[in-house]
From Swiss-Prot:
Entry's localization field: Cytoplasm
Molecular-function annotations in GO: 3-oxoacyl-[acyl-carrier-protein] synthase activity; beta-ketoacyl-acyl-carrier-protein synthase III activity
GO biological process terms, semicolon-separated: fatty acid biosynthetic process
Entries under NCBIfam families matching the protein: fabH (TIGR00747), PRK09352.1 (NF006829)
Annotated protein name in UniProt: Beta-ketoacyl-[acyl-carrier-protein] synthase III
Active site: 119, 261, 291
Provenance organism: Prochlorococcus marinus (strain SARG / CCMP1375 / SS120)
Calcium found in the keyword field: no
Domain of life: Bacteria
Pfam families recorded: ACP_syn_III, ACP_syn_III_C
Length: 338
């Protein structure tokens, strides 16, 4: 799928927020449970620690906190929000987490729904929400990326448990009659390679009546072929990014920042090197949070905005990629107040 705004309104990115759990689990602490060590994890992934939701926290609460921060930065009243879209694969309620977040946020006018696209989820969610603003259906929306992967990993599998963490990030976007900040995007999927990274439903059947059976709802832990996912990312992300840059007439040198899904530092560096983008232009906080799936991009963007790295008018190339397999690239300008 390809697109940008050609009719109607533009979209402006005007606020960001993020929230992470209070529990911080270091590589050394994980080494008390599985056969690993800090150097092994850092060398292969770039991760030093991750945040894990504890007994007194919930993903819903993190979403609300992130959304409030984004709305406050934008200077909105919550009553002006018309859409709350949450990209998540791990909602607190399988029927949808967004309506509860909408209620706790006080955005009583907003339609609220979830979108599931794993690590590509936030980018897909941003593009999806933008369509409603560009065609005039809504004026203001909050897009949230949030996941609690700690509940779905096998904590005795050292190859996967060291990778993931929990968190939520949010972006406030609004329709504008001025130039569109969402310059363009492309999104792709390939379900034939879905077994490389999945969180599959268990096929557990229990007696129902007479000779009939019914499937009991349950899921297996996250399963990942790390080598295949790495090869997928370093092949497909640069290819699609090159396509998007050429389509919209942008040279890599004009980018202020490269903002990739925070999966593995080797992937981030490999994509940057393909375009001769200096590593200091690659936004990364992977060392502190690990892979938080749909939350990585908005958490990183919020941190960079609040740290003064990303400033109003900066041009950003962003890519989400992962389970599905799905991946996408978006070009946008930050228009927030910082």
């Amino acid at each position: 799928m390809t697109g940008n705004s050609s009719n109607g309104y533009g979209v402006s990115l005007v606020g960001s927020g993020s929230a992470t759990p209070s529990q911080i689990v270091s590589n050394d602490q994980l080494a008390l449970r599985v056969d690993t060590n800090d150097e092994w994890v850092k060398t292969r992934t770039g991760i030093r620690e991750r945040r894990i939701i504890g007994a007194d926290e919930s993903l819903t609460d993190l979403c609300v906190a992130a959304a409030k921060a984004a709305v406050d930065m934008a200077g909105w009243g919550v009553e002006s929000i018309e859409m709350v879209l949450i990209a998540t694969s791990t909602p607190d309620d399988l029927f949808g987490m967004a309506p509860k977040v909408q209620s706790k946020l006080g955005a009583t006018r907003a339609v609220a729904f979830d979108l599931t696209a794993a690590c590509s989820g936030f980018l897909f969610g941003l593009v999806s929400a933008a369509q409603f603003l560009q065609n005039g259906s809504f004026k203001r929306a909050v897009v949230i990326g949030a996941d609690q992967l700690s509940g779905w990993v096998d904590w005795d599998d050292r190859s996967s448990c060291v990778l993931f963490g929990d968190g939520a990030g949010a972006i406030a976007i609004e329709a504008t009659a001025e130039e569109d900040d969402l310059i363009g995007f492309k999104m792709k999927s390939d379900g034939s390679r879905g077994d490389c990274l999945n969180l599959a439903q268990k096929r557990n059947f229990v007696p129902l009546v007479e000779s009939y059976q019914t499937q009991k709802g349950d899921f297996s832990p996250i399963k990942m072929n790390g080598q295949e996912v790495y090869k997928f990312a370093v092949r497909e992300v640069p290819s699609l990014l090159k396509d998007v840059l050429q389509t919209y007439g942008i040279v890599p040198e004009s980018l202020d920042w490269l903002l990739l899904h925070q999966a593995n530092q080797r992937i981030l560096n490999a994509v940057a090197d393909r375009f001769s983008i200096p590593h200091h232009k690659v936004l990364t906080n992977l060392a502190n949070y690990g892979n938080t799936s749909a939350a990585t991009i908005p958490i990183m963007l919020d941190e960079a905005v609040r740290d003064g790295k990303v400033q109003s008018g900066h041009l950003i190339a962003s890519s989400g990629f992962g389970a599905g397999l799905s991946w996408g690239v978006a070009l946008f300008r930050w228009h927030g107040p910082f």
